[in-house]
Every structure is written in C-alpha cells, then in structure tokens.
Amino acid sequence: MEKKRFVLVHAVCHGAWSWYKVKTKLEAAGHCVTAVDLAASGINMTIVEEIQTLMDYSKPLLNFMSSLGSDDDKVILVAHSMGGIPAALAADIFSCKISAVVFLAAFMPDTRNPPAYVFEKLIRSIPREEWLDTAFGRYGNPDCPLESALLGPKFMAKKVYQRSPIEDLELAKMLVRVNPLVTNNLAGARSFTGEGYGSVTRIYIISGEDNILPEDYQRWMIRNFPVKEVMEIKDADHMAMFSKPKELCALLLEIADKYA
C-alpha cells in the first residue's frame, strides 16, 4: 500500500496519548502518523483559562496543518468525540490539504448551524447525575461564561471505557486534564462553510456500544449531514482505539486505500 499521512485528533480531557495503539499499528503498516495535543491537553502547556475561542483550543492542530507544504501529501484527518469540532474547523480552513475526515464516534458539525450545535444538542439532554463524578467549571466573562470539564474516574469506568482494558482506563485516570467544552460561547455562531469543510470527503465510524455518544445520536448526526461512507465497530465502547484497536486500524487502512 502507498504510504499515507494520518493526523489524529483526541477527545475532550484526553490527549495525543490516547492514540498510542493506533499510531503504532498504522506506522507498522508503513504510514506516517501525527497525533496532536489540542490546547491544554496532553503535554500542551496552555491552561484552560487562556482558551477563549475554538481557534484557541484548536491552535496546535491548525499550526500543524499550516506547516504542511504544497508538496506534502494530503492528510487523512481522524477525529474522536469532541475532537470532531476542531477537526471540522481545520477542514474548513485547510480543505485543500485534506483527502478525508474520519469521524470516530465524534461530534460532526454541519454547514447550517453553529459549530457547537451537535455538541450542545446532546450535552443539554443528559441529566447532571449521569455525569457521576465528572467535575464541571466555568471561567471567563460572567455574562458569557465558558465551560470546562474534567472526566471523573467513575464516569470513565462506567460510560467511556466500559469495554476497554483496565490498563487503559488506569492510564486515562492518570493523564486526563481539565478541558474547555466546545459550547456556543466558545465556538461562536458562524457555521462552517460548504466551500471549505463541506467540500471535504467525510466518513463516519460508529461505535456500537458507546455509552456517552449513543449509537442513535451518531446515526442522527449522519442523517443531519450525510457522509460518503458509514462504517461500524459493533462492540466498541466510546474509546474504540482501546477496546477495538485492530478493528479500528483495519477500517482506517481501508479508508486510506479508498479515499487518499
């Protein structure tokens, strides 16, 4: 298979570290892989209070995309969970540098509504008690507050990592950080463009046993903004890169072969 370039975008409170299994497997298959830490994530030194906009949160990803020259191969952008919104922003700005965007159990914006619409729609429907020990906070202007979260260990065990190896859950407990939530106040009202983000090939990978982004909501997002292809990992929890890494990598290699 021809060498392809993957760029991996992590979930809220996580970091590039969450892709360690997938990165290893894709590189072993001969591909070039970059896993990005978004702002205030992983080893990125930004603190949450410095993040006032979606651009701020997405800056490391945007900087990487900007660094790619015209002679570089187009990338396959793979976004997980809330990372779907920064990935959509990158696709809107750098559509000419992207061969496909893969949404893995990810929030997938459309080109009609504000960027955070798909996140707000789900998040506001979940009763606070279902978040268990997750800690929420507010910062910034009291008249237009920004929101943050730190996923709790009980919540991760029950809702996020319930089918993943216990070692990966323990890793996450050690490494998760407070992150901004991509709400309307952070992302703004301006929707992504049809000429940019809307022009890029999109593929959605459904996690069939996802307890935080339910399958029916994943399918609603696909109906809301149809994609080129829908794939599914039936027994994956929200963290398919941990619970079903082989199956996920097989799909990513298939996508690379078809669309890159």
From Swiss-Prot:
UniProt keyword terms in alphabetical order: Hydrolase
Family matches, as Pfam families: Abhydrolase_6
GO function terms (MF aspect): methyl indole-3-acetate esterase activity; methyl jasmonate esterase activity; methyl salicylate esterase activity
EC nos: 3.1.1.-
PANTHER family, A to Z: METHYLESTERASE 19-RELATED (PTHR10992:SF1020), METHYLESTERASE FAMILY MEMBER (PTHR10992)
Role of this protein: Putative methylesterase.
Family, similarity comment: Belongs to the AB hydrolase superfamily. Methylesterase family.
Protein name (Swiss-Prot/TrEMBL): Putative methylesterase 19
Gene expressing this chain: MES19
